[in-house]
Amino acid sequence: MSSRFALTIVLLSAALFAGCATKPHTTLEMTWVTPQLPQAPFRKLLIITVANEELVQIAFQDQMAAQLKAHGMNGVASHRYFTRYTEAEKARFRRSIEESDADYVLLARVTRTARESREDQVMNVGDATGLYTTYDRYVSVARSAGDYSTKTITAEASIFAVSGEKMIWSARTRTANANVTTGEHFAPQYVAVILEAMKKDKLL
């Protein structure tokens, strides 16, 4: 084997490895489910999102709703996107739910962490378990999440009963190298992981 040919192989291998290493990759970190899941199927599951980028929210809501319907669940994109914490936005959030006639809400939020392994501004599941108190926490985290360069996205999707405003299920995911893609292209693998988590916990 000539030295030039060997060098070419090495360079191609390095390029392939670098390409794989920088592709976004979503994994499920954990889930929590109430010991007493509702026996009746969800009549209408409203999808609402909180993140610092609306494009991510649009892609997630539309794709999640389509996939839920494909699995026999009436998932409905709210087409309401939240990035700021003001009293007006909090009122709009509550109004979006009240006007939807949904019996359950899937509330998803995306936060970003620094390139280091620390989890700056990541909210633990259980920090807030009420539907509207969780919104308060999510928005405060989402706003600070865009203040620095990122490499990893930590996201949580939680389902709440509108009656009683209690959380019945939650999942946390982590997407490495999320900064190399867009919301539209990030959403499919994130949605797929959430769906598998819902199946695992017998929500689908």
Task: Describe the predicted segments one by one.
Residues M1-C20:
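Sec-dependent bacterial lipoprotein signal peptides
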Residues M64-K69, R95-S96, N124-T129, A176-N179, ...:
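Short, low-complexity, polar/charged sequence segments that are solvent-exposed and flexible
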Residues E89-I159:
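Surface-exposed short loop/turn segments
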